[in-house]
Each structure stands twice: as structure tokens, then as C-alpha cells.
């Protein structure tokens, strides 16, 4: 899979913010007409202080897992809100290189454009891959919204400070906390929401990222990271 090199990773926070603002202008919000049949879910965690683990699970349109890969490496960039992709991006890229199947779409456990500078990890990584991407976050980072209804499929839009729609607050399971869905690259707001619902079963989170998280927990439990 082709991965574009658009910037350095070893940069200051000020430089990272400038990179985010620049890359934001390169995003496309047009979803390609090609049918989505193979999707990937991404989960990044830190089982040890300076050890990162990235898991990618690839599924077909029946939600069957057809490939899974993982990669570990040392990560010495600390977590700073709004700069997650600079901490997790390099390990994600190394994990993507292990894939034999090329997904049509990537789901990320994180933000797309619902981000202070419009470039969360889903948008950032989608741009590097030139692949459709979206973020489904468990918690709110940026944007104003009203609480959606309590039933599955209820939603409200998220807005940035200028009133532009940047995502949705989506109820994926009745009477549970909503998720925060925003487009990454080659994606629009409404398609991101409909795809999230399509790939969400009886649980709160979409199956691609849920299965990636399950594999992460299995790897850690089985001590495969030692």
C-alpha cells in the first residue's frame, strides 16, 4: 500500500500545529463512488510507558475478519491533547505495511475533522494513505452539539466555532452513551455516520475498531508483547 511522506515526525508542538493546519487544506470530503466491501479497524494502545502497540483488523462486508496484523515499537513522544497522530502515526504506518489485503476504508478510534485544527488521527492517516477514513471516538474533543435522542440511530450535528458541520454525535445503541463520528479523508459527514451505523452490531462501537480492540486485549493477556 502506498504511503505518502508529507512531513517530518520529529517536530515541536508549534511545528506540528502548523503541519496540521497545512494538511487540513489537502483533505477531500468527497466519498468515492466505489463500493466499500473491505474495511479496516485500527486500535493503538500503550501496554508499557514507552511501548506502543498498533492492531489493524480487516473485515469483509459480512463482518468476517479476513486479516489481522500488529506491530510494536518504542514511542517516546508524550500524549498531548490535539496531537495524538504525532504520537500514534508512526507505529500505525509500520503496521499498515504488514497488510496483504488493501482495505477500501479505515475506521479509527479517534477523531477525524472534529479537532481544534481540523486534523485528528483519522484525517491525518487517511491523507497519508490516500484512502477514505473516518473517526469514531468514545469521547468528545472539539465542537458544539446538542444531546441526541436515546434510540439507536438518533444523532445531532457537531459544529466548529464558525458554525460549520464537522461531524455527528450518534447513538449506536439505545440508552448508552453516544459516539462522536467525524469524517477523515475522502469522506463526508453523513456518509461517515451511515457507515458507522452499517458496521455497528449490537454493541456501542463499530465492529472494525471493536474487533481490533479485542485482539489488542488478547495480545496483552497472552503476554505476546514481552
UniProtKB/Swiss-Prot annotation:
<comment type="similarity">
    <text>Belongs to the endonuclease V family.</text>
</comment>
<dbReference type="Pfam" id="PF04493">
    <property type="entry name" value="Endonuclease_5"/>
</dbReference>
<feature type="binding site">
    <location>
        <position position="109"/>
    </location>
    <ligand>
        <name>Mg(2+)</name>
    </ligand>
</feature>
<feature type="site" description="Interaction with target DNA">
    <location>
        <position position="79"/>
    </location>
</feature>
<keyword id="KW-0234">DNA repair</keyword>
<dbReference type="InterPro" id="IPR053396">
    <property type="entry name" value="Endonuclease_V-like"/>
</dbReference>
<comment type="function">
    <text>DNA repair enzyme involved in the repair of deaminated bases. Selectively cleaves double-stranded DNA at the second phosphodiester bond 3' to a deoxyinosine leaving behind the intact lesion on the nicked DNA.</text>
</comment>
<dbReference type="GO" id="GO:0016891">
    <property type="term" value="F:RNA endonuclease activity, producing 5'-phosphomonoesters"/>
</dbReference>
<dbReference type="GO" id="GO:0006281">
    <property type="term" value="P:DNA repair"/>
</dbReference>
<keyword id="KW-0963">Cytoplasm</keyword>
<dbReference type="GO" id="GO:0005737">
    <property type="term" value="C:cytoplasm"/>
</dbReference>
<feature type="binding site">
    <location>
        <position position="43"/>
    </location>
    <ligand>
        <name>Mg(2+)</name>
    </ligand>
</feature>
<keyword id="KW-0460">Magnesium</keyword>
<dbReference type="GO" id="GO:0043737">
    <property type="term" value="F:deoxyribonuclease V activity"/>
</dbReference>
<dbReference type="GO" id="GO:0003727">
    <property type="term" value="F:single-stranded RNA binding"/>
</dbReference>
<keyword id="KW-0479">Metal-binding</keyword>
<keyword id="KW-0227">DNA damage</keyword>
<dbReference type="InterPro" id="IPR007581">
    <property type="entry name" value="Endonuclease-V"/>
</dbReference>
<protein>
    <recommendedName>
        <fullName>Endonuclease V</fullName>
        <ecNumber>3.1.21.7</ecNumber>
    </recommendedName>
</protein>
<keyword id="KW-0255">Endonuclease</keyword>
<keyword id="KW-0540">Nuclease</keyword>
<keyword id="KW-0378">Hydrolase</keyword>
<dbReference type="GO" id="GO:0000287">
    <property type="term" value="F:magnesium ion binding"/>
</dbReference>
Amino acid at each position: 500500500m502506498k504511503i505518502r511522506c508529507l512531513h517530518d515526525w520529529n517536530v515541536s508542538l508549534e511545528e506540528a500545529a502548523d503541519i496540521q493546519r497545512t494538511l487540513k487544506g489537502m483533505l477531500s470530503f468527497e466519498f468515492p463512488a466505489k463500493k466499500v466491501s473491505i474495511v479496516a479497524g485500527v486500535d493503538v494502545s500503550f501496554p508499557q510507558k514507552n511501548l506502543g502497540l498498533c492492531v489493524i483488523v480487516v473485515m469483509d462486508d459480512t463482518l468476517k475478519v479476513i486479516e489481522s496484523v500488529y506491530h510494536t515499537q518504542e514511542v517516546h513522544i508524550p500524549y498531548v491533547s490535539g496531537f495524538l497522530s504525532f504520537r500514534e502515526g508512526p507505529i500505525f504506518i509500520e503496521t499498515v505495511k504488514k497488510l496483504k489485503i488493501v482495505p477500501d476504508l479505515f475506521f479509527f478510534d479517534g477523531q477525524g475533522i472534529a479537532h481544534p485544527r481540523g486534523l485528528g488521527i483519522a484525517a491525518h492517516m487517511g491523507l497519508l494513505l490516500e484512502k477514505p477514513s473516518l473517526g469514531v471516538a468514545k469521547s468528545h474533543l472539539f465542537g458544539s452539539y446538542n444531546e441526541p435522542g436515546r434510540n439507536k440511530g438518533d444523532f445531532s450535528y457537531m459544529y466548529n466555532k464558525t458554525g460549520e458541520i464537522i461531524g455527528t454525535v450518534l447513538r449506536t445503541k439505545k440508552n448508552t452513551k453516544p459516539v462522536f463520528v467525524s469524517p477523515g479523508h475522502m469522506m463526508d459527514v453523513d456518509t461517515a455516520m451511515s457507515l458507522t451505523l452499517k458496521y455497528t452490531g449490537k454493541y456501542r462501537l463499530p465492529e472494525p475498531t471493536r474487533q481490533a480492540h479485542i485482539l489488542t486485549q488478547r495480545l496483552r493477556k497472552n503476554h505476546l508483547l514481552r
